[in-house]
């Protein structure tokens, strides 16, 4: 099931990046960020109300660093819009994917933020290198 969720996430993130960039051209970058965060909040509140199984009272037991997810969302929306607006969808998302994979590799390799430490070996580095070469080939001018 994890693969299905990852595919849905990847498609959704690409669509969101394009939609946000296009909306930003009409109403402004920060205004779009507000709309995105607000609609996300409303939808999440409805879903949480009907199907939520957690407890907001447990937030006092959470690592306070992990509360920065919303602030990171603002950074993500801003930077995705600027990258897609400046480089186009495919190139922008390609660079984003490489950066995500590198960051995830570092998090795994060092077991950061309480995650399980997962070895990052030669074949992982080769995979990232192949992605980088792929982006270079993709943008190569004829």
Please report, for each region that a protein language model flagged, where it lies by residue.
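Alpha-helical transmembrane segments of multi-pass membrane proteins
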Residues: 13-16, 100, 104, 134-135
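Alpha-helical transmembrane segments of compact multi-pass small-molecule transporters, enriched
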Residues: 39-43, 95-110, 129
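Hydrophobic transmembrane alpha-helices of multi-pass small-molecule transport proteins
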Residues: 120-139
């Amino acid at each position: 099931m994890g693969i299905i969720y990852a595919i849905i996430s990847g498609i959704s993130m690409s669509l969101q990046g394009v939609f946000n960039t296009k909306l930003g051209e009409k109403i402004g970058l920060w205004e779009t960020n507000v709309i995105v965060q607000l609609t996300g909040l409303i939808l999440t509140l409805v879903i949480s109300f009907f199907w939520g199984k957690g407890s907001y009272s447990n937030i006092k037991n959470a690592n306070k660093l992990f509360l920065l997810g919303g602030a990171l969302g603002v950074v993500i929306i801003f930077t995705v819009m600027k990258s897609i607006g400046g480089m186009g969808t495919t190139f922008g998302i390609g660079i984003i994917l490489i950066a995500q994979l590198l960051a995830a590799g570092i998090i795994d390799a060092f077991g950061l933020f309480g995650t399980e430490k997962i070895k990052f070996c030669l074949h992982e580095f080769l995979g990232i290198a192949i992605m980088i070469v792929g982006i270079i080939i993709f943008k190569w001018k004829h």
